[in-house]
Amino acid sequence: DEMFNLSELISVVIEKYNNENISQNLTPRIYFNGRKNLINRCLNNLIDNSLKYANKVEISLSKKNTNLFIIIDDDGPGIPKNEYENVFKPFYKIDKGRADSKSSVGLGLSISSDIIKSHGGNIMLEKSKPDGLRVKVFLPV
């Protein structure tokens, strides 16, 4: 594990996409002690996922008490609430909506969830306003 600037890492990841449809609202200088390469992979998986299904993606980073929150909102078709648990299973793909004609093996969310859990955190899904998907990542400081 290493201490690194998570705000900077997220910013660098977003810049690599060179996509004007990704906006960011990052609290500066938030540091995290963890495996930077794995957090980087997780961020890429989550952003890739959102971009597959949405036009606009917004990423925010904040800190409350002893938790860090990374929130990724997209304006895609969303996922039915009854599928929220299932999409974290390896190779699981929803038949309709988000899975239509998209090339995916169904591992991105599973791997991301494993990475976050290995850091003592969690990933949750909820409906984004107005209709997309919100991915909430909690990490303990």
Question: PLM features: what roles do these ranges have?
Answer:
Residues 56-66:
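Short beta-strand/loop element within the Bergerat-fold HATPase_c
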Residues 74:
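Acidic ATP/Mg2+-coordinating residue in the GHKL
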Residues 108, 112:
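Short alpha-helical Gxxx[C/S/T] motif in the catalytic ATP-binding
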Residues 22-33, 64:
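Conserved catalytic submotifs in the C-terminal HATPase_c
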Residues 120-121:
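Conserved glycine-rich
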Residues 79-92:
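Short conserved segment of the HATPase_c
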Residues 39-40:
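A residue-level detector for a conserved hydrophobic packing site
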